[in-house]
Design a protein with these regions (language model features):
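Conserved N-terminal catalytic core of the sugar/cofactor nucleotidyltransferase
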Residues: 2-5, 13, 27, 31-104, ...
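Active-site metal-binding loops of divalent metal-dependent hydrolases
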Residues: 10, 105-107, 133
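Short, high-confidence coil segments that cap the C-terminus of an alpha-helix
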Residues: 47, 97, 124-125, 201
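Catalytic-core segments of class I nucleotidyltransferases/pyrophosphorylases
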Residues: 101, 108, 117-121, 148-238
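A structural signal for short hydrophobic beta-strand segments in well-ordered beta-sheet cores
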Residues: 25, 142-144, 205
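Conserved donor-nucleotide/metal-binding helix-loop-beta segment in metal-dependent transferases, i.e.
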Residues: 111-139
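N-terminal nucleotide-binding beta1-loop-alpha1 segment
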Residues: 1-19, 202
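Anionic-ligand binding region
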Residues: 127-129, 135-159
Length: 238
């Protein structure tokens, strides 16, 4: 199996930082965030190759410079036309594969990729998405009765009414043919492709359970969630 890391995008949410370096290079303990993702993926023996998609003609060149001439990582120029276009760029890289892992670089999580793969196969799904059903809130809550606060709850762990989808996917290679059939410049993987497949019962979910997750969009976000990031890296075994 090959793991594809999407490290392109304009990093709009991470501005002004992403005007100077890509979000993949957000620093964590002196190393870029993408390095933790790469090392974690390589800890699974069934992942034979890591491919990083980014704009190497722009800020993404910093990623390539960081890794230098490493032979165990392949660098593919992004399409500048969204996730769908990026996946079309790697079609030939998947020639001998039946499935692949897709990881958006700003997702930091010790999701058990082995168990996720088992879910993917057991459900005979076209796609499997990492999800979570609970999260720790960033603000305090209160129990209110008749306008009077009876009790405070400091940043509680809340059960979500709907499962939250994370940016980590396991996909059949045939997904690329479905993207081609759309014949449109911008293809949103979730809403243009997976939405249709979900109606056919072909999209499964892998709950990350007690594993933590953070959307690492900027250095500010990482700094604000420093304890959480440290916990995730420990869960990753790094």
């Amino acid at each position: 199996m090959k793991a594809i890391i999407l490290a392109g995008g304009k990093g709009t949410r991470g501005k002004p930082y992403t005007e100077y370096f890509p979000k993949a290079m957000n620093p964590i303990n002196g190393k870029p965030m993408i390095d933790y993702v790469v090392r974690y993926l390589k800890s699974f023996n069934f992942i034979k190759e890591v491919i990083i998609i980014s704009d190497y003609n722009g800020l993404g060149g910093q990623i390539k410079n960081y890794y230098g001439d490493r032979k165990d990582i392949k660098f593919i120029q992004d399409s500048q036309s969204g996730t769908g276009g990026d996946l079309l760029h790697i079609e030939k890289e998947l020639k001998n594969e039946s499935e692949f892992l897709l990881w958006f670089v700003d997702n930091l999580c010790a999701v058990d990729v082995k168990k996720m793969r088992e879910t993917f196969k057991e459900k005979n799904s076209f796609a499997c998405i990492a999800t979570r059903t609970k999260r720790k809130e960033e603000t305090g809550f209160a129990i209110v009765e008749n306008g009077i606060i009876k009790k405070f709850k400091e940043k509680p762990i809340m059960k979500l009414q709907l499962s939250e989808c994370l940016g980590i996917y396991m996909l059949r290679k045939e997904i690329i043919q479905k993207i081609k059939k759309k014949k449109q410049k911008q293809v949103n993987l979730s809403f243009d492709i997976l939405q249709e497949l979900s109606k056919e019962g072909k999209v499964s979910a892998h709950d990350i359970a007690d594993k933590e997750w953070v959307d690492a969009e900027s250095p500010m976000m990482l700094e604000r969630n420093k304890k959480l990031v440290t916990k995730i890296i420990k869960q990753m075994g790094l």
